[in-house]
């Protein structure tokens, strides 16, 4: 399936077969693809919690205004933004770049995020949004 077909054939599913269970291999494959989602400065400032335990999914269903999808779906993925990723070893994904580039990236991260909780929050929301879109495809 190409990108255009994946986008045009995507649908919002409201009813799930509560008896269907994703295999751990399917969940692992999905998450390996999800972590390829883009993030600003390659911060990878999202964290994912996969939930398959039925009792926890029921609690999530209540928190989600009693929607059936979290309860009946095989898997719930909680997307969490890490708002301190910009300072948690930010150059770990830039190791193969020249030192000058690494220094520029670090300075840019500090300038954009050090004094702005709003920027950190907005970036975490964007990054989780990209990851969510990847999951839905």
Feature-to-residue mapping (PLM):
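Acidic, surface-exposed loops and disordered segments
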Residues: 1-137
């Amino acid at each position: 399936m190409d990108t255009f077909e994946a986008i045009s054939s995507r649908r919002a599913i409201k009813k799930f077969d509560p008896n269907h269970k994703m295999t751990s291999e399917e969940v692992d494959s999905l998450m390996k693809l999800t972590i390829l989602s883009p993030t600003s400065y390659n911060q990878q400032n999202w964290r994912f919690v996969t939930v398959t335990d039925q009792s926890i999914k029921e609690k999530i269903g209540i928190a989600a205004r009693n929607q059936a999808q979290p309860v009946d779906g095989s898997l719930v993925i909680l997307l969490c933004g890490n708002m301190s990723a910009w300072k948690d070893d930010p150059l770990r994904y830039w190791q193969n770049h020249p030192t000058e580039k690494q220094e520029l990236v670090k300075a840019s991260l500090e300038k954009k995020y050090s004094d702005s909780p709003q920027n950190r929050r907005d970036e975490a929301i964007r990054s989780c949004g990209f990851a969510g879109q990847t999951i839905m495809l």
